[in-house]
Regions:
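Glycine-aromatic micro-motifs
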Residues: 2-159
Length: 159
C-alpha cells in the first residue's frame, strides 16, 4: 500500500487542466485520487492567449474557480515536473510564465481551507497584464473561444 507524503500538496487548477479541458486529459487523467471544486481568494483572472493567468490582488472580491487535484502518490513527483514544464515555471526565474506557490484554497464541499500548489502569473507577465491585460471574471470556463472550441495550451512536446 502506498502512503501519502505530507509534503505532497494538492494542485489548484483553474484553466486548461480543469476536467473536460484538453490538458486535463493529457496530464491528469488516471493520475489523480480526487478532483474537487474549490475557490482561490486574493487573486484576479486575466485572459491570456488561449489560457488564463491568476494574479495576486489583495482585497479581490471574486474568487477564482477551479479544482483541487490530489495526485496519486506514485505519480506525484513526475507530475510535479511535468506541470512545471507545461506552465513554463522555472524556480527563481522572474521571466517564467508562471510561478508555483503555496496558497490556501477553499474546498467547496465543506468550506475547509486546503494548502495547495497554485500556478500564478510570473513577475514579468504580471506586470504586463496589470498594464494592458484583459481581466475576466473568476471562472475561465465561461471564457471559451467564440467558436465554442476549448482554449488549450500545447503541452510539452506538443508545441
Amino acid at each position: 500500500m502506498t502512503t501519502r507524503d505530507p509534503r505532497h500538496l494538492p494542485f489548484f487548477v483553474y484553466g486548461t487542466l480543469r476536467p473536460g479541458q484538453l490538458n486535463h486529459d493529457a496530464f491528469l487523467r488516471g493520475r489523480t485520487e480526487t478532483e474537487e471544486p474549490g475557490h482561490l481568494g486574493g487573486t484576479v483572472l486575466y485572459d491570456g492567449p488561449g489560457y488564463p493567468y491568476a494574479v495576486e490582488e489583495p482585497g479581490a472580491t471574486d474568487p477564482v474557480s477551479g479544482e483541487l487535484v490530489t495526485a496519486r502518490p506514485e505519480a506525484y513527483d513526475r507530475l510535479l515536473l511535468e506541470l512545471d514544464e507545461l506552465e513554463e515555471c522555472v524556480p527563481g526565474d522572474p521571466a517564467s510564465l508562471y510561478v508555483r506557490v503555496e496558497r490556501d484554497v477553499v474546498r467547496l464541499r465543506d468550506g475547509a481551507a486546503v494548502r495547495a500548489w497554485v500556478y500564478l502569473a510570473g513577475p514579468t507577465v504580471t506586470e504586463r497584464l496589470r498594464a494592458d491585460g484583459r481581466r475576466i471574471d473568476g471562472d475561465w470556463l465561461t471564457h471559451r473561444a467564440p467558436d465554442g472550441r476549448r482554449r488549450t495550451r500545447p503541452g510539452p512536446d506538443r508545441r
